[in-house]
Amino acid sequence: MRALILSDIHANLEALEAVLDAATGMWDVVWDLGDTVGYGASPNEVLDAVRPLAGLTVRGNHDRVCSGISSAVNFNPTARLAAAWTLEQLTDDNLIWLRSLPQGPIEPEPIATGCGEVRVTLAHGSPLDEDQYIVSMRDAWAPLQQMSTAVTFVGHTHIQGGFWQRDHEWHEVRPRYRERRGHGEWTLEILPGTRQLVNPGSIGQPRDYDWRAAFAIYDSEACTVTYHRVPYDVAKAQGRILMARLPERLAARLREGR
């Protein structure tokens, strides 16, 4: 079974379209780790594309605020303005769908493979707290110790990579891409006996100084995660943000990758 892992699309239609095009033929199921909306200028278009595809979606903090479930009191002024704009734009169907999203962590049905059953967890921030940012080994320590499955997929940080632990070994994962025609790719083997936190990165607003849209493919038979980076029409996405009169900073940071 191959899962296309999406996260932090943030209403960036151009980035999502580039990812879906690049991932054609690579997946059997789609898992969305949340923050599908917020910041970007195409919330309905993105939701209309994701809803029929995603087998499982967990909510993110922007999904909660943009749908009116949570207050924006902890958001910075730019994020707060974008969330209010998004709530005004959402169709009734998309608003209902966002409000119905489950809080992570959730576990998909166990996956039968030649090596036995495989269980994984999906969360937005962390398997312990949906709003936790896991950006360092210190952040990863408790989730790796306490999560209920050997592999947990998380988003929220907008940084592609992750962390793994086996016995007394602790490692941070940063992809070392093999580049071809602007598309970066790197495969991580999930070793027996390890516990893995896997972050596919952000599709719509990367913050690891690489502006390209990020996603991952999990192959349960091969026991691998392949990280991908794909270019997209940033100028068009920026133009949508400016046309919507959202803060200019939201457009500028797309090219900066931070």
Regions found by a protein language model. Name each.
Residues H10-A15, G38-A41, H62-S67, L128-E130, ...:
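Active-site environment of divalent metal-dependent phosphoester hydrolases
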Residues H168-R258:
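Acidic, His/Gly-rich catalytic cores of divalent-metal-dependent hydrolytic chemistry
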